Design a protein with these regions (language model features):
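Periplasmic solute-binding protein
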Residues: 1, 21-27, 98-107
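Short helix-loop capping/hinge motifs at secondary-structure junctions, enriched
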Residues: 1-5, 32-35, 108-117
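Immediate post-signal peptide segment of exported/extracytoplasmic ligand-binding proteins
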Residues: 1-10, 189-195
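Bilobed "Venus flytrap"/periplasmic-binding protein-like clamshell domains
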Residues: 3-72
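Short, surface-exposed acidic
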Residues: 35-39, 146-157, 190-196
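Pocket-lining segment of extracytoplasmic ligand-binding domains
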Residues: 49-141
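Conserved C-terminal helix/tail region of periplasmic/extracytoplasmic solute-binding proteins
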Residues: 176-208
Length: 208
């Protein structure tokens, strides 16, 4: 399957005005499809609404869903299949990783509490490593704290979630490329202009 197969189809998605919309429209354009003319995109406020609509539409449904909703939906309906992985498709047209979640700290706090920020990042990296290395333990924790209804869903979804730790120049390159996509789609999405170098955290930034 390819993006060409989406031409003339209706796509169900969450996130109008947020990451899902901008990434989907970017990838459609990169693959020669006009998102305003060649496809119809229907937006819903929650992923659960998308899966409900898919169930109602049955075999004709095409949807953009994040993990773990993809896995949860497939566990309920074995006929559902992933035909395009947006992370892989992003990697085909962009030299940097697709970013869907970041950690943000206020500059004033980072300058006043540099050790706390650094220690948090160390713990965060350990958490990322644990999420990838201890699937069973992480899945159980996901159920315990209510991230997913059942650990079995998390266990299947976690290896597909692309949970990574990025910092420094690597992080800056990935985030900057993503913000450029947002800016090109709608400057207002990033406050009207792209951020300067001070926007990105480095230990050197804190040490000033």
């Amino acid at each position: 399957h390819s993006f060409a197969d989406l031409k003339g189809r209706t796509i169900l998605s969450t996130g109008k005005g947020t990451t899902p919309e901008y990434v989907l429209r970017y990838l459609l354009r990169k693959n020669g499809i006009d998102p305003d003319k060649d496809v119809k995109i229907e937006y819903y406020s929650e992923a659960s609404e998308v899966t409900a609509q898919m169930a109602a539409t049955k075999k004709d449904a095409i949807a953009v869903l994040p993990q773990p909703y993809v896995t949860a939906a497939q566990m309920k309906d074995s006929s559902l299949r992933v035909v395009l992985d947006l992370t892989r498709e992003w990697n085909k047209v962009c030299d940097t990783q697709l970013i869907t979640g970041v950690t943000v700290v206020r500059t004033a706090y980072a300058e006043e509490h540099p050790e706390e920020v650094i220690n948090f990042l160390k713990d965060y990296q350990k958490s990322v490593d644990a999420a990838n290395d201890d699937i069973d333990g992480t899945a159980a924790l996901c159920e315990e704290v209510g991230v997913v209804a059942k650990a079995a869903i998390a266990k299947k979804a976690l290896p597909k979630c692309n949970i990574v730790y990025r910092i420094g120049d690597e992080m800056k390159a990935d985030v900057n490329a993503y913000l450029q996509v947002l800016y090109d789609a709608s400057p207002a999405a990033v406050g009207g202009k792209l951020p300067d170098a001070n926007f990105y955290y480095t230990e050197a930034t804190v040490a000033k």
